[in-house]
Amino acid sequence: MYKRIKGTEDIFGDDIKYWYYIENVVKETVRLYGYSEIRTPIFEATELFIRSVGEETDIVQKEMYTFEDKGQRSITLRPEGTAPTIRAFIENSMMATGLPKRLFYIGPMFRYERPQKGRQRQFHQFGVELIGSPSPLADAEAIIVADRVLKNLGLLNYTIKINSIGCDKCRANYKNALKEYYSDKLDYVCDDCKRRYNTNVLRLLDCKVDVEYIKDAPKITDYLCDDCKHHYEETKRLLDNLKIKYVEDPLLVRGLDYYNGVVFEIHHGDLGAQSAVGGGGRYDKLIKELGGSQTPSLGFAMGIERLIIALKNEKIPVEEIKNNEIFVAHLGEQARIEALKIAEDLRDNGISVVFSTMERGLSAQLKHAARLKCKLCVIVGENELERNIVILRNMETGEQIEIERDYVVGTAKEWIEG
């Protein structure tokens, strides 16, 4: 017997309603802000992620699913959604239709890491990208959209953490301060941090092992230039004016190399040590780095599996999918033909119908309808058909009535709507 690959999940049954719910809330929320959907391939040229995410990041070093195809091209299953979206923006000359461009995506991503609750090797994200605006208004909008998505989902126990990691000049001064701080600690840090010290010292702040050193590290907000400080303060002022709650975290740097300026993360209190459900920030140099024109941009993404855990932990009621509202049972050859017509009439009126496709007795058909949790059962028999009537049965109460064939749809709708 074949089994699913480690780090993947089969999604079905009652869990599906959470996926429908999140996807619908996301699409409706971002529509309010003028975002259009984009769908990119799940695999891209490996170089795209090396150039964008950063060669020294854990994603590129340890987590990417990379293989050589039959044309000897290095291909990678996408580990995140921003780089493919920006590649599509450049390749399809989207700048020609005007800026800023607002795009969103929903889909699977892939990272080879230790599977745990809410973190699989195939996982799903939705993301939002606001391309072409240098204004703090854009930074504020991204955070506002993220906050509204969470509110519209019904979540309460979340925290938005924000910071600024400045421009190249700010970070150069800050990196020197970090190097000095860690210089007498290199004998005590993990092997990854020893490597990061020489390749990208900012990544030391991502370490999950040597956290005791991180809390006393220098704060980048003390090294911001006047322009970056003003941009950060203006972003916070805009959020304050709209009463968007946030917490400043001066050690927040994000795990991808393309970020600059304002960055943020969303954490949920019911997710334990791995509490992040999403994050994002500004990436003003990424489009030029990938072959386009200098275009200031920013975005964020959230993990759908993580959001589902948060919804369940907060006991947010999620509407059941309206499947299997009516079961149509039949007894006899002529009854079967008429029952099929009735099923289609009901579907024409937007009612979900399960039609019995098995040669079974009435008792077996009713048991099947009960297992499917159908609300009603329409029973079509040869004797009833001769009198131009059918039986309508309430599967919850057992009550049933005879009605004329022509009134099946109207009566069924009344019963369903209660």
From Swiss-Prot:
GO terms for biological process: histidyl-tRNA aminoacylation. This is Histidine--tRNA ligase. InterPro entries: aa-tRNA-synth_II (IPR006195), aa-tRNA-synth_II/BPL/LPL (IPR045864), Anticodon-bd (IPR004154), Anticodon-bd_dom_sf (IPR036621), His-tRNA-ligase (IPR015807), HisRS-like_core (IPR041715), HisRS/HisZ (IPR004516), HisRS_anticodon (IPR033656). GO terms for cellular component: cytoplasm. Homodimer. Its EC number is 6.1.1.21. It holds the Pfam family tRNA-synt_His. It comes from Thermosipho africanus (strain TCF52B).
